[in-house]
Regions:
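Short S/T/G/P-rich N-terminal loop/turn motif that feeds into the first structured element of a domain
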Residues: 1-55, 59-71, 94-96
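C-terminal structural segments of small proteins and small subunits
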Residues: 63-91
Length: 96
C-alpha cells in the first residue's frame, strides 16, 4: 500500500496563537501515526511564484489514513485553534 502525504504551506499571522495550534496538531499527529518529514525549516524558491514561509510535510501509512487524520476530532480542535493564527494551504497526495 502506498503511503499518504499531507503537504501544507503556512503563513503565520499570530505566532502566539499558532503555538497552541502546534501543541494540538502534534497530539493529533501522534494519535494518527503521522511521521513528520518537514516542519518549518529553511526554504528557498527555485522556480515559479510559490514562496511559502513555512512548509509542513507529513507521512501516513496510506492516503486514507491521511484523510482520517485530517477529518479527526483531534485535528479539528487544532484547526479551530489555527483559524485566526495562520493562513493554510494543504493537500493530500498518494505516494508511489
Amino acid at each position: 500500500m502506498a503511503a499518504g502525504y499531507i503537504l501544507a504551506y503556512v503563513d503565520v499571522t499570530d505566532p502566539v496563537q499558532y503555538e497552541q495550534y502546534k501543541v494540538l496538531s502534534t497530539k493529533a499527529m501522534q494519535a494518527h501515526g503521522a511521521e513528520v518529514l518537514v516542519r518549518g525549516g529553511k526554504t528557498e524558491q527555485l522556480e515559479g511564484e510559490w514562496a511559502p514561509t513555512r512548509v509542513v510535510l507529513l507521512k501516513f501509512p496510506s492516503y486514507d489514513a491521511a484523510k482520517v487524520f485530517y477529518d479527526s476530532e483531534e485535528y479539528r480542535a487544532a484547526r479551530d485553534a489555527r483559524a485566526k493564527a495562520a493562513k493554510m494551504n494543504m493537500i493530500v497526495v498518494e505516494g508511489v
